[in-house]
Design a protein with these regions (language model features):
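Basic, Gly/Ser/Thr-rich N-terminal segments that form RNA-phosphate-binding interfaces in CRISPR RAMP
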Residues: 1-246
Length: 246
């Protein structure tokens, strides 16, 4: 039986969570998304790869590089080898192929699930960065962490209620009219101040409680797409400024 644990990831720069090739190569699924909120997620394989790299690069004076690699494989599983290693020569026999592929991956001591959003930073021209979430994301955060717990008042020690948008009858629209909060596609209206949002800021993060916004579950995907940084990833030839594979 595994011992369950969770962690909070605070990204200090735009995070690439999609495929390395974009629409120019026919890839229409540019980002890994949660099926319920259509917001970006970090696959567990990416998190495991980061831990593997840190463990391999760590300085262990009492261990050789091979011993460090073996220890990494024990904790995070044997790394999958490239497919081109199969049958590199025409003389590869079936027995040799079996020997090279049977131990490609092994069970790890540590298993990672995907990382979901809690607060999403959205750029607002002329205003501070605002952090947006929805009740469904906060509910998932509460189920995983078992909190937050109210620290003051009559309800001290109780589980905090999941905050909801101020007006449940009217969804959030991005309108071309003047209102409280301006996004890059319009204005966000129907905003009310909620003091209880401070409980939903993970401890140790630098998110300002005054810059938090909770929207409807149906609207978080649109705002999420607005907040994405559009950037095409390309690889140039070494000797000429020309994109490879084109």
């Amino acid at each position: 039986m595994y011992h369950k644990a969770y962690g909070i990831i605070e990204t200090l720069a735009p995070l690439h969570v999609g495929a390395s090739a974009g629409e120019e190569t026919g890839n229409l699924n540019l980002i890994f998304r949660d099926q319920f909120t259509q917001t970006g997620i970090i696959p567990g394989s990416s998190i495991r790869g980061r831990f593997r790299a840190d463990m391999r690069q760590s300085d262990r004076p009492n261990m050789t590089s091979n011993q460090t690699k073996a220890l990494t494989n024990v904790w995070y599983g044997h790394d999958s080898e490239a497919d081109e290693t199969e049958g590199e020569s025409d003389g590869t026999t079936e027995a040799n192929t079996t020997d090279t592929t049977k131990d490609r991956t092994t069970e790890a001591l540590v298993k990672f699930e995907y990382a979901s959003l809690v607060w999403l930073p959205v750029f607002c021209p002329g205003q501070p960065i605002v952090w947006v979430t929805c009740p469904r994301l906060l509910k998932r955060y509460q189920q995983i962490t078992g909190g937050p717990i109210i620290q003051k008042g009559d309800k001290k020690g109780q589980l905090a209620n999941i905050p909801k948008p101020s007006d449940g009858k009217h969804p959030v629209y991005l309108r071309e009219e003047r209102d409280r909060l301006f996004f890059n596609l319009g204005f966000l209206d129907n905003l009310d101040k909620r003091p209880d949002l401070t409980y939903w800021v993970p401890t140790g993060t630098k998110v300002e409680p005054d810059n938090l916004v909770v929207v409807q579950d149906a609207d978080i995907s649109l705002i999420h797409d607005m907040a994405l940084y559009r950037q095409t990833r390309t690889q140039l030839h070494d000797d000429v400024k020309q994109i490879q594979n084109f």
